């Protein structure tokens, strides 16, 4: 296992591993100990009281962060006819049909998110083995298989985040750039956790939000008191 550098260890030394902080305290620690020259992303991990092995306890969804992610998102739309122009007018970086499928077959992957109209899913399915493992496959449950391209493309460009609970019961998601400042980051976190709570499966028993941690791209994790959720979510 690689050893952490002096700056990382210094940042970790400011954190009490036994303490569960408020969101404000945790953000002050996370953003106050930045030691990299680039604008780091703040990530959140929420441990839920669900068992994802059971279909009725799966948590999966999307949220449009009020302050975005602070980075450009390259959107590719699989469409044909007038829908190609609609996608491009909405802000898509790439839009087209079989020609894009062929480019991807050849190894082209210069995009971050994909959307498809339902009538294109047959063609898109041919590159499922390329897109699927990379988390790039359009998905009806996440709203990325649709004819309403204007709405979806604009949401993605504005900072739409897809998430799903992992086998361990943890959900990970980016919350924006450290440079946003505490107020905007808390607004993003609030929107995300509010969405998680709304998606609580009826089959989930006991405490739902069991653990929360935040970290910057290169920084150590900071534990947050799950009860602090009440201070940022109505």
UniProtKB/Swiss-Prot annotation:
The entry's keywords: Repressor, Ribonucleoprotein, Ribosomal protein, RNA-binding, rRNA-binding, Translation regulation, tRNA-binding
PROSITE patterns: RIBOSOMAL_L1
Keyword Protein biosynthesis recorded: no
InterPro entries hit by this protein: Ribosom_uL1_bac-type (IPR005878), Ribosomal_uL1 (IPR002143), Ribosomal_uL1-like (IPR023674), Ribosomal_uL1/biogenesis (IPR028364), Ribosomal_uL1_3-a/b-sand (IPR016095), Ribosomal_uL1_CS (IPR023673)
Cited Pfam families: Ribosomal_L1
GO molecular function: rRNA binding; structural constituent of ribosome; tRNA binding
GO CC aspect terms: large ribosomal subunit
Gene Ontology biological process: regulation of translation; translation
Self-association state and partner proteins as the record states: Part of the 50S ribosomal subunit.
Family note: Belongs to the universal ribosomal protein uL1 family.
Function noted in UniProt: Binds directly to 23S rRNA. The L1 stalk is quite mobile in the ribosome, and is involved in E site tRNA release.
PANTHER family according to UniProt: 54S RIBOSOMAL PROTEIN L1, MITOCHONDRIAL (PTHR36427), LARGE RIBOSOMAL SUBUNIT PROTEIN UL1M (PTHR36427:SF3)
Protein name: Large ribosomal subunit protein uL1
Organism of origin: Syntrophobacter fumaroxidans (strain DSM 10017 / MPOB)
The organism's taxonomic lineage, starting at the top: Bacteria, Pseudomonadati, Thermodesulfobacteriota, Syntrophobacteria, Syntrophobacterales
């Amino acid at each position: 296992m690689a050893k952490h550098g002096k700056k990382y260890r210094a940042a970790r030394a400011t954190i009490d591993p036994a303490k569960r902080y408020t969101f404000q305290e945790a953000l002050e620690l996370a953003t106050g100990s930045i030691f990299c020259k680039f604008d780091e992303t703040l990530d959140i991990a929420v441990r839920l009281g669900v068992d994802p092995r059971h279909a009725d306890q799966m948590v999966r969804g999307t949220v449009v962060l009020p302050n975005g992610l602070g980075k450009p998102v390259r959107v590719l739309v699989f469409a044909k006819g007038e829908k190609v122009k609609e996608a491009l007018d909405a802000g898509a970086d790439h839009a087209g049909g079989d020609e894009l499928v062929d480019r991807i077959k050849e190894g082209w992957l210069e995009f971050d998110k994909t959307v498809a109209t339902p009538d294109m899913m047959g063609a898109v399915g041919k590159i499922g083995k390329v897109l699927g493992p990379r988390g790039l496959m359009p998905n009806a449950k996440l709203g990325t298989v649709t004819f309403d391209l204007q709405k979806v493309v604009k949401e993605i460009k504005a900072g739409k985040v897809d998430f799903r609970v992992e086998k361990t019961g943890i959900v990970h998601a980016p919350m924006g750039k450290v440079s946003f400042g505490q107020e905007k980051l808390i607004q993003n976190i609030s929107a995300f956790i509010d969405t998680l709570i709304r998606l609580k499966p009826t089959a989930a028993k006991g405490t739902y939000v069991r653990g929360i941690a935040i970290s910057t791209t290169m920084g150590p994790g900071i534990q947050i008191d799950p009860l602090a959720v009440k201070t940022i979510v109505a």
